[in-house]
Amino acid sequence: MRPSDLTRFKQKGQPIAVLTAWDSLSAALAEAAGADVLLIGDSLAMVALGHATTLPVSLDQMLHHTQAVARGLTTMPADQPLLVCDLPFLSYQCGEDRAVAAAGRLLKESSAAAVKLEGAEPEVVAVIDRLVRMGIPVMGHLGLTPQAVHRLGYRRQATDAISQERLLEQACTLEQKGCFSLVLEHVPAELACRVQQALTIPVIGIGAGDDCDGQVRVTADLLGLTAKQPPFSPALVDGRRLFIDALKGWVNQTRNHTPPTNGRITQADRT
């Protein structure tokens, strides 16, 4: 999968499925499920590393997890999902040279094919322009931007007419600067529809209604593994309860010296 494939998907009206991955196991599961894009999101700071926000994760950690995701893929390279890696907080807000070095390192030292940046401030737009001119594919991200949590919080964004027009202008600017796709997070569905119609690049939504060109979800949220679910990303299964019950069953079997309840005794059970 290449960035240009997503544009063809939009032209054909084929919805784009994006899942997050943070290690080889989550990557293998998402690939087997048929995801078009695997996003190594800085949400791994919360999902995998136990932080309260995405801010603490470092570039080295993002690289480490991206390499692990790449190792989890099993299909031929041409058939693999597109790997997109978030540039973490302060890896691109402190100057174009630093941003190019960070993005270049992710692409050189892992199998990532693109990076994602949040926001459309003039400094970020300049970075996007520079990265694209250097041959680095960029995915944009507007609406709720978790790296700005201390300024904007986790509330719904662009809820009034002025902010909606501003976001639409920002989206058009990101396309003009060369972004190959755009994530819209936690914004009104009507606004997302307007953005989708205004852009030729794919618009990937999360909490932005059903009229986007695709959807992105944090895999752990979909599987119900997180203790607190985002209101715009309901779980499909109660994975947390399933896992706890399974592990609790094994603990009880071990303590009671009882065989597995399904009757199967594996070599691991015998050792």
UniProtKB/Swiss-Prot annotation:
It holds the Pfam family Pantoate_transf. CDD domains: KPHMT-like (cd06557). Its cofactor is Mg(2+). One of its GO terms (cellular component) is cytoplasm. GO terms for biological process: pantothenate biosynthetic process. Keywords: Cytoplasm, Magnesium, Metal-binding, Pantothenate biosynthesis, Transferase. Its main location: cytoplasm. It comes from the Bacteria. One of its GO terms (molecular function) is magnesium ion binding. It catalyses: 3-methyl-2-oxobutanoate + (6R)-5,10-methylene-5,6,7,8-tetrahydrofolate + H2O = 2-dehydropantoate + (6S)-5,6,7,8-tetrahydrofolate. This is 3-methyl-2-oxobutanoate hydroxymethyltransferase. It comes from Synechococcus sp. (strain CC9605). The lineage of its organism: Bacteria, Bacillati, Cyanobacteriota, Cyanophyceae, Synechococcales.
